[in-house]
Amino acid sequence: MAQENEKELQQLKNRFHDLAERSHAQGVFTFTGFLGLSDQEVFWQEEPGLRYAGYTLYGGCDQADRVVVRFGDSGELGYETDFPVVCIHIAPLAEKFADELTHRDFLGALMNLGIERSTVGDIRAGGKQAYLFCLDSVASFICDNLIQVKHTRVRCSVTKDFQDILQEEPETVNIQVQSLRVDAVISRVYNFSREKSLALFRTGKVYVNGRLCENNSRILKSGETVNARGFGKFVLTGEARETRKGRLAVDVAVYR
């Protein structure tokens, strides 16, 4: 299993370098598929050897967790091109009889179609509908074949009308901590024990601003985004204020 994982890791690294080299040598833009946080970390590890080609990351919407990397610089190449990313609106045929559907429900239905995970980006689910970002190469297939999610019959259509609908509304909470260490803030936001918080770091499940964070004592700054895989993400939205008891009070926007 370890050898298999190492092989996949090396293949991903090679893919990044191949795409960067092809962009640079042929004077064209090249694209990855959608990358999750762990694959993005591999990209950032390799980034010093890729930056010569120029690159841009984009996931289709603000604060996307899954992104596509485009290699190539429009200033150097002399032209611009869009990312091959489209948005699909998934809605019930009969809302009255539709289930309340979760992100997991929509993702499971998509994976049952047999498509690669790398062709699918963020899924913004709410109530009985969702907005899905995917590669344009699979959009028609999804629209033609995704007809049911859980027990709900659905229709799919490519849309550009999603900017307002897709704004996830975070829950703003005020927490008090001894310090802005990332492990302490995670413990307070999710009401974890210190041991459970530290376990997230040991298993590589904490990302700060899209980068793997292995240093649990890292001090967070206002505006930084923390992803705790499996639990959600949050953003420090204000400056810390000292309380009368010497603790730090800070506002956090929590995305469940």
PLM feature segments, named:
Residues 209-210, 229:
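Short strand-turn-strand beta-turns centered on an Asx-Gly dipeptide
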